[in-house]
Design a protein with these regions (language model features):
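Glycine-rich beta-alpha loop elements in corrinoid/cobalamin-binding modules
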Residues: 44-164
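Short boundary motifs at domain starts and secondary-structure transition points
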Residues: 1-9, 70
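A structure-centric signal for secondary-structure junctions around beta-strands
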Residues: 10, 35, 154-155
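Short polar catalytic/cofactor-binding loops
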Residues: 17-22
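Glycine- and acidic-residue-enriched helix-capping/strand-helix junction motifs
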Residues: 23-38
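Nucleotide donor/acceptor-binding cores
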Residues: 9-11, 77
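Short amphipathic alpha-helix
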Residues: 35-42, 96
Length: 164
């Protein structure tokens, strides 16, 4: 795995939140659910000087719709997927489509499914890293080390494709 080096520039991260449990639902009627985990990650990264945005998915997206929303958000160094077990099949598609739009983006996955079965998530094509457990400080360390051009593969709670 080639390490991502931001050459002193703070990281730009997009957090993707598939906020639906029923794959057949047309659309959530409300504004969706609040994710304390993603809010905490966003706050810690922003306090560290990094740029963070959210792509809040309130319903299952087609390839065309997902890619359109992704492009509308702009370009990022890192895209993080919050993966519950019920959303894992959809996230596999979202990750594939993300890599088709931004082939060089670094993809990190976290949340419940990643903590329960990290090897299954890490085996998905396009996934660079999986966070097991709370992600605020491991992801801050990841972003800081990318900014500094340092090796980040020893960051606690993060597992990479080349790990045994």
């Amino acid at each position: 795995m080639e390490l991502k080096n931001l050459h002193g520039r703070k990281a730009r991260m997009l957090l993707v939140y598939p906020d639906y449990t029923d794959r057949d639902c047309a659309r959530k009627m409300s504004g969706g659910n609040y994710s304390e985990g993603l809010a905490s990650i966003s706050a810690v990264l922003k306090q560290g000087g990094h740029h963070v945005e959210l792509l809040h998915l309130l319903n299952l997206h087609t390839e065309e719709d997902f890619k359109k929303r992704l492009r509308e958000k702009g370009e990022f160094d890192i895209i993080g997927f919050s993966i519950r077990t019920t959303a894992f099949p959809d996230c596999q598609n979202y990750i594939k489509w993300t890599k088709e739009v931004y082939p060089d983006v670094f993809i990190i996955c976290g949340s419940y499914h990643c903590t329960l079965v990290p090897d299954e998530v890490l085996a998905v094509d396009g996934v660079d890293c999986v966070c097991v457990g709370d992600g605020e400080y491991p992801e801050l360390e990841l972003c800081d080390k990318m900014t500094a051009g340092e090796d980040y593969t020893d960051t606690k709670s993060l597992y990479f494709k080349n790990d045994d």
